[in-house]
Amino acid sequence: KFEAEKVLWEVSLKTGLEVTVVRLPLVYGHGVKGNLDRLIKLVQLGIPLPLSLIQNQRSMIGIDNLIDLLIKCIEHPNAAGKTFLVSDGKDLSTPYLINYISTSMGFSSRLFPFPIFLLKFLFTIIGKKKEVDRLTDSLKLDNGHVRRVLNWTPPVNVDEGIRRMVQGK
């Protein structure tokens, strides 16, 4: 990704092409794939998940907010030549996300406590270290720069975005 950005900036310098880089966290919304889709399916199946002790914070952005931001980048003259970190502006813990997905589907979440170090150890043994890190580690993006420069505010709050994603499943 970094190499691609470098190439874009070089092309911009040589040709005068206006470039704006948007760095994304996890994107969620209708038709989501990957780990979030697997998590939704586990909630649907009512499988108990050993994740209640996780105290991470992860930035995310809903597809509706991302589309709104990209339109703003195209239209706003101050976007050219900038790099923006973007998110919905509310960082979520894994248990909060699972609880909200469950509630949006009309279920109660089935989380139970399990030592995080042991969870990480077991996932590492079976070759799923990246997956467990995404569930347990924090990744927070500060979207203050994009809010100030473009006067952008995400039009859809996180809870509504998650509800829309789940309803679209």
Regions found by a protein language model. Give the residues of each.
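A short C-terminal helix-loop "cap" of Rossmann-like NAD(P)-dependent dehydrogenase/epimerase domains
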Residues: 40-51, 107, 112, 142-144
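Mid/C-terminal beta-alpha module of Rossmann-like enzyme folds, strongest
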Residues: 72, 76-130, 159, 163-166
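Flexible, glycine-rich beta-alpha linker
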Residues: 17-38
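Residue-level signal for the nucleotide or nucleotide-sugar donor/cofactor binding architecture
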Residues: 34, 58-64, 92, 141, ...
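Short-chain dehydrogenase/reductase
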Residues: 1-5, 26-29, 56-61, 91, ...
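Active-site Tyr-X1-5-Lys
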Residues: 1-20
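Conserved C-terminal active-site "lid" loop/helix of NAD(P)H-dependent oxidoreductases
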Residues: 63, 99, 122-153
